[in-house]
Amino acid sequence: MKYKRIVFKVGTSSITRSDGSLSRGKIQTITRQLAALHRAGHELVLVSSGAVAAGFGALGFKKRPVKIADKQASAAVGQGLLMEEYTANLSSDGIVSAQILLSRADFADKRRYQNAGGALSVLLQRRAIPIINENDTVSVEELKIGDNDTLSAQVAAMIQADLLVLLTDIDDLYTGNPNSNPDAVRLDKIEHINHEIIKMAGGSGSANGTGGMLTKIKAATIAAESGVPVYICSSLKPDSLAEAAEHQADGSFFVPRAKGLRTQKQWLAFYSESRGSVYVDEGAEHALSEQGKAC
């Protein structure tokens, strides 16, 4: 098989209804395909959003909350509901699922990064399907990874995946917004992610999620630089996961760097925290604090 170890990422809108509640039908479509790929011998990881969206209704919120504490409480409820659906569906096919909640600190700290990678390796060797989400209940805003597109790319690089698939309700990458620009052309293959590609990606995603095409391009950069090819394709098609695994998906494919960064360089490039101090003399201090400019 071309791609044995695959990381799939599904966004909030791909597994919820328009009112933000979980769609069992959409989740069943995803788990059905995962089960088929698992039987075919693939090693699979699923990075799934949706905890906040699944939980806020159960707590009585009429719409997705904006306050941090409200979102964290919603995630605490919703993560359990989310895993309940995935576990029930996969166990009916005899597949063990494992919940892993990660935060930026798990990548920034080298020992925790190595421990997480080790646990994932064992789960894959034992034929389990890890289901990963950011630990929204305890992550503070300034220390969050921020979106699961980035998280999935970091996980794909960590475990040296053969493919990262970003599933979305946004139909691939175009040269412009196809909803407003009839001349927009879909990009089937991207050899190199440059400023023009980033500019094409535009802005935000759906009302229930945190990502958009721009976050997917940034995620594709992390994965491709680490030697992992990336597909961005629609989650609305019934066999989208299987098609991506066979390199037959109708989406945008990002070619990886020929020689991907090794684990140590990945950690230094993308995850380690930069720290330092800048010392200035009295003249520079005066210019910065009193005159508001650098000298």
UniProtKB/Swiss-Prot annotation:
Q: Which Gene Ontology cellular component terms are annotated?
A: cytosol
- Reply yes or no: does the keyword Chloroplast apply: no
Top-level enzyme category: transferase
Localization per record: Cytoplasm
Q: Which reaction does it catalyse?
A: L-glutamate + ATP = L-glutamyl 5-phosphate + ADP
Q: What InterPro entries does UniProt report for this protein, alphabetically? A: AceGlu_kinase-like_sf (IPR036393), Asp/Glu/Uridylate_kinase (IPR001048), G5K_ProB (IPR041739), Glu/AcGlu_kinase (IPR001057), Glu_5kinase (IPR011529), Glu_5kinase/COase_Synthase (IPR005715), Glutamate_5-kinase_CS (IPR019797)
Major subcellular location class: cytoplasm
Annotated coiled-coil segments of the chain? none
Cited function: Catalyzes the transfer of a phosphate group to glutamate to form L-glutamate 5-phosphate.
Q: What is this protein called?
A: Glutamate 5-kinase
Q: Which organism is it from?
A: Neisseria gonorrhoeae (strain NCCP11945)
